[in-house]
Amino acid sequence: MPEVWLGYGDSEIILDIKYENILRILRPEIKVISPENLRLNIHNNINLQNSTLVLITTPFPKMLDILKIINQLSHELDIELPDVFVLSKPFMLRLRQDISKESLSIARIEPDELIKKISQYRNVILIDKIQYDPVFGFAASPTKLIRECYPQVMNQIYATTLDELPKPGLSGEALKITMETLSELNCQMIHVYSDREVIDSIYFGHDINSFLESVKSFKEKTSTTSDFSKSAFISSNTTYTSQLNLGNSLNLLWNNYHSVLEGGTIVLLSENRGGVNEGAISKFVEGRLDLNGLDKYQYINEIEHIKFLQLLRDKYEIILISTLPQIYLNKLGLKSVSKIKDGLDLIFTKNGKYSKSNIIPVSEITMVKNNPA
């Protein structure tokens, strides 16, 4: 049997599956940029000076390599080290441990403090990891800023997505609105294509529109093709928050649910030690969200997941491997099992012991394109 390891929270678990039951393992090829080339790229493309703010909009493991190089270059230039902030809720244990291990000084900042903080510095550098996103098409610094700091813009974007299916990998109206809103933002940008272990590519820009070129290259590198499958296993753990809460995990689902035939089964690894995020999902499971009024609401955090579930949960059997109480998942129309083997057994019961599944280990950096049925 092959060893297929899938991310589950901060760890990995093995999917004990035979070769003959695997249609394809769908993941992008990730090349490794050498430490020397990484340093050279940062040296040649980033302006460092006194009064510099470095903002990480999504914490991810390989950000630490970039921050160490920025600090080294600052020492060589004999300038003050930049102030580094992460746009984050209280740091997860793994993130705190990794920061401590590297002896880096990184502080946390809340969204309501951020815009004022940016105005206090002469030089601002935004850093993030590019991922797929079912609302914006792609996620990184620009979209994270809109989600966290521009509620009125999110209302506008939400109004354009009503009754629409997830659109990962498409540069549509939501991304257009994002670019227009942030067009006057004066900053440098570093966007990264990486998994948990290595960096493949690093993209630089000196205005917000550079993000569009970054995601174009990212999509070319991370798209893969496959036949439709009757079932799939979807997971990821390439950021510190990939499966932190249910909303994070559902993003993984929406990015590649389309690789499965309607009526098929999707097993989603969704540890969710952070539970259900404060927002639309928690309001719904507590009976405080009227589904008949979704088109009348202003944007509530993660309301897109309620909308997508309404559109898709009757078309697929969605099974979660999760620590969340089943009573929560029942209200969302989702099933759960305690072990990944139980998910595989349910697929065999439904489709037969010779059925084949697609396996998508890093769904936030994978775009599956289906061959014609």
Question: Language model features by range: what are they?
Answer:
Residues N50-L64, F85-S88, F233-S235:
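Short glycine-rich or small-residue beta-strand-to-loop segments that form or flank ligand, phosphate
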Residues L38-L55, H75-E80, T224-S231, S259-E262, ...:
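Glycine-rich phosphate/diphosphate-binding loops that line cofactor/substrate pockets in enzymes
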Residues S249-L250, W254-A373:
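C-terminal non-catalytic interaction/assembly regions of soluble proteins
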Residues E102-S236:
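Conserved, well-structured core segments that form the ligand-binding/active-site neighborhood
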Residues M63-E113:
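Well-ordered mid-protein domain cores that form the structural environment of catalytic cofactors
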Residues P59-E80, S249-V260, I266:
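Histidine-anchored nucleotide/phosphate-binding helix
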Residues M1-N37:
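N-terminal amphipathic/basic leader segments beginning at the initiator methionine
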Residues I30-L38, E102-E110, H206-S210, L334-G343:
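Short acidic-hydrophobic, aromatic-tinged amphipathic segments that line or gate anion-handling sites
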